[in-house]
């Protein structure tokens, strides 16, 4: 974005405003609005560069309208005795209005006709010079946000830094006063200073015996745990061996097979009886 401070000449008089309008353009309003929305609010020189490299076909037409608006603004500034460049102007407004629609038709089969709508549009672009307020706002925006944020943090951090420097200085003074009082009390009463090393020494001498007893107790407990584990491993196979063998019950024969066999035996008996009766006869 081109800054207004780097322009060729800055206006000291009133703000210069100019516009350019293209009427009855054969570009549809929807396609023209896609291009116009991209340059609205941009500086005039940046808007021209953007329109130069846009892939849309409407960008060439909008470029011509913007160039005409810039030329109109330069003429207005010349009347006031000022000089303006594209860097000194900004696209303040840009919009597209819908023009009349030309209705045509396309003949189709069996006497039918399809309607054709040829839409037109009116493209309008307004430009104006940078006012003094806009220049100050632009210079503020030119400063990166990180620098302003760092300045704000450093300004707010000064009281905290002073407090941090004061507190460490106060703590050592209090500590030194307490040590002086303790030393004075120790010099006044000698017995407390003599008794504390003895107590510490007795505690130091007692600790090895206690640690030895604890280690012995721990070793005995580990030995007991090992013996119990061995006993459990030995008793487990014996218990498995003592278990009696489980006999599975024999599978019962199905009732259907038994019935079939009974029927067959009855049939054999009836045949034998019939043969016996025939022999006797």
From Swiss-Prot:
Keywords: Ribonucleoprotein, Ribosomal protein, RNA-binding, rRNA-binding
Record organism: Acidothermus cellulolyticus (strain ATCC 43068 / DSM 8971 / 11B)
UniProt name for this protein: Large ribosomal subunit protein uL22
Gene Ontology biological process terms from the UniProt entry: translation
Ranges for region Unknown: 226-281
Region (Disordered): 137-175, 199-281
A Pfam family hit: Ribosomal_L22
Biased composition annotated in UniProt, kind: Acidic residues: 272-281
UniProt key word RNA-binding: yes
Stretch list, region Large ribosomal subunit protein uL22: 1-225
Family statement drawn from the similarity comment of this UniProt entry: Belongs to the universal ribosomal protein uL22 family.
Free-text function comment from the UniProt entry: The globular domain of the protein is located near the polypeptide exit tunnel on the outside of the subunit, while an extended beta-hairpin is found that lines the wall of the exit tunnel in the center of the 70S ribosome.
Positions with biased composition (Basic and acidic residues): 261-271
Quaternary structure annotation from Swiss-Prot or TrEMBL: Part of the 50S ribosomal subunit.
Keyword Ribonucleoprotein annotated: yes
Residue stretches of biased makeup (Low complexity): 159-175, 199-239
Molecular function as annotated in GO: rRNA binding; structural constituent of ribosome
Sequence ranges of Basic residues compositional bias: 139-153
One GO term describing the cellular component: cytosolic large ribosomal subunit
Encoding gene per record: rplV
Signal peptide: none
């Amino acid at each position: 974005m081109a800054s207004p401070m780097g322009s060729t000449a800055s206006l000291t008089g009133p703000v210069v405003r100019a516009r350019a309008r293209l009427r009855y353009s054969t570009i549809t309003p929807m396609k023209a609005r896609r291009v116009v929305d991209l340059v609205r609010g941009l500086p005039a020189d940046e808007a021209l560069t953007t329109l130069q490299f846009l892939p849309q076909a409407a960008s060439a037409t909008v470029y011509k309208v913007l160039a005409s608006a810039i030329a109109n603004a330069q003429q207005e500034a010349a009347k006031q005795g000022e000089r303006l460049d594209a860097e000194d102007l900004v696209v303040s407004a840009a919009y597209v209005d819908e023009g009349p629609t030309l209705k045509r038709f396309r003949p189709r089969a069996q006497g039918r006709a399809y309607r054709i709508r040829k839409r037109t549009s009116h493209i309008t672009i307004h430009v104006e010079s940078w006012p003094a307020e806009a220049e100050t706002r632009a210079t503020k925006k030119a400063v990166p946000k990180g620098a302003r944020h760092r300045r704000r943090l450093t300004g707010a951090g000064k009281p905290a830094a002073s407090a941090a420097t004061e507190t460490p200085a106060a703590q050592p003074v209090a500590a030194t006063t307490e040590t002086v009082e303790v030393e004075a009390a120790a010099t006044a009463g000698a017995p407390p200073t003599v008794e504390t090393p003895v107590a510490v020494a007795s505690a130091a001498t007692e600790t090895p015996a206690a640690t030895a007893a604890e280690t012995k107790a721990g070793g005995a407990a580990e030995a007991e745990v090992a013996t119990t584990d061995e006993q459990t491993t030995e008793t487990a196979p014996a218990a498995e061996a003592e278990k009696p063998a489980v006999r599975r019950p024999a599978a019962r024969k199905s009732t259907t097979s038994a019935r079939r066999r009974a029927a067959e035996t009855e049939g054999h008996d009836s045949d034998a009886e019939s043969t016996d009766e025939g022999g006797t006869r």
